[in-house]
Design a protein with these regions (language model features):
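Active-site-proximal alpha-helix that buttresses catalytic centers in soluble enzyme cores
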Residues: 2-55
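Phosphate-handling substructures
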Residues: 51-109
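Acidic, His/Gly-rich catalytic cores of divalent-metal-dependent hydrolytic chemistry
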Residues: 168-174
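Short beta-strand scaffold positions
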Residues: 38-39, 108, 126-127
């Protein structure tokens, strides 16, 4: 999705429903599609409407960003002296977010939402950075953070009958 105020201020923005603040990062080349699936949060819907103005948007709740719990809408500066945050950092992000989602539950939710949304039609998924990383790791392996993307960026790959038939390539970020 495009840039939000929380992204600009480097906050953990998961369940907070923020609007886009600009579309500058959405000037890249995006693949044509017959359908769009998006997270229900405004930043994804607004991005989908901007990139694909003539395509109906289908909503998938399971593709929402992670629930960051007590870290939600806070920055590193806000959290750096919090012992729970330090424990989470020391775990390489594997510990559950206090009063939020576990990393594994989040990744499984995103994977399930992705596969439930697949059809034989060319589909663009307009979702969150964390959701992209979760799906890519589940599909292609490797480290979760290997798939980190900037706002407006993502990956393109081909699947048939639920199977990957082509390696991924980066998209967006003109």
């Amino acid at each position: 999705h495009g840039m939000t105020e929380g992204n600009l201020k480097k906050r953990y923005i998961g369940t907070t429903d923020e609007d886009l603040i600009n579309t500058d990062c959405l000037k890249g080349d995006y693949p044509k599609c017959e359908r769009v699936v998006a997270s229900p949060l405004k930043r994804c819907i607004q991005t989908a409407e901007y990139i694909y103005p003539n395509v109906d948007i289908e909503i998938c709740d399971k593709l929402k960003e992670c629930d960051f719990g007590d870290f939600e809408n806070k920055s590193y500066e806000d959290l750096k002296d919090n012992p729970d945050y330090q424990k989470w950092l020391d775990s390489n992000g594997e510990l559950p977010f206090p009063n939020g989602e576990t990393h594994e539950d989040f990744k499984n939710r995103c994977k399930d939402g992705f596969f439930e949304s697949l059809t034989e039609r060319d589909t663009a998924f307009v979702i969150h950075g964390g959701s992209i990383m979760a799906i890519m790791q589940k599909l292609f392996g490797g480290n979760f953070y290997d798939y980190q993307v900037k706002n407006g960026c993502g990956y393109e790959f081909e699947m048939r009958n639920g199977e990957i038939v082509d390696d991924y390539s980066p998209i967006g970020c003109g």
